[in-house]
Design a protein with these regions (language model features):
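Structural signature of alpha-solenoid helical repeat junctions
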Residues: 15-22, 29, 56, 79, ...
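Conserved, well-structured interaction surfaces
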Residues: 1-41, 74, 91-99
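Alpha-helix C-terminal capping/termination sites
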Residues: 36, 40-43, 121-125
């Protein structure tokens, strides 16, 4: 998905601004997916006893080309360097070329949030300052806090992107009614 867009965006019709907006969105999502995989399948970057130069990351898929060869696993350092590069490139492209019209598209505010989370997760001393910087940029440019008393009437509460101004980006989807616990007093009669 993301690599197809990145590899072929120059060949599609549209203005340079539209192409750069697509490139920014695809690059941000590629970095996001690599980060999600790293969070699940890799050792923590700054964990005790972990050397990012020798610890293995997840395979970096940077092109849409498929081969029969198994992809190699780069070092954790190389993986995180590529994720950071994707996020920074995407942030620059999105700041200059695109403002999303709904919460299901990524824009520069989502890029700031993801960069902040990336730096927190990587966790180096210099990374924490960058996490604060990008979180501040997200807060400055992003949505205002919602009044919680206005949201409690919905099943989804603060997660309702139609009601809450705090939602920066939504991806995936599932029913809140199926996955939410609703307390009940139906079993009170069992207790004497």
């Amino acid at each position: 998905g993301c690599n197809v867009i990145i590899d072929y965006v120059s060949e599609v019709s549209g203005t340079e601004q539209e192409k750069n907006a697509l490139l920014g969105q695809a690059t941000l999502l590629r970095g996001f997916y690599h980060l999600k995989l790293a969070m699940i399948y890799c050792q923590a970057y700054t964990a005790s006893g972990v050397d990012p130069k020798t610890a293995l990351g997840v395979p970096l898929m940077l092109t849409m080309d498929l081969t029969d060869d198994y992809p190699e696993r780069p070092s954790l350092e190389a993986l995180y360097s590529q994720i950071e590069q994707d996020f920074l490139t995407a942030t620059s492209l999105l700041e200059e070329n695109y403002t999303p019209d709904n919460v299901y598209r990524v824009g520069s505010v989502a890029a700031y949030v993801l960069l902040s989370r990336f730096y927190l997760f990587r966790g180096g001393d210099e990374d924490l300052d960058k996490a604060i910087q990008y979180a501040g940029m997200a807060i400055e440019k992003g949505p205002m806090l919602s009044r919680l008393s206005m949201l409690m009437g919905t099943d989804k509460s603060i997660y309702d992107s139609d009601m809450s101004s705090e939602v920066v980006w939504c991806y995936g989807g599932y029913s809140f009614k199926v996955n939410t616990y609703f307390p009940t007093d139906a079993y009170q009669s069992i207790v004497p």
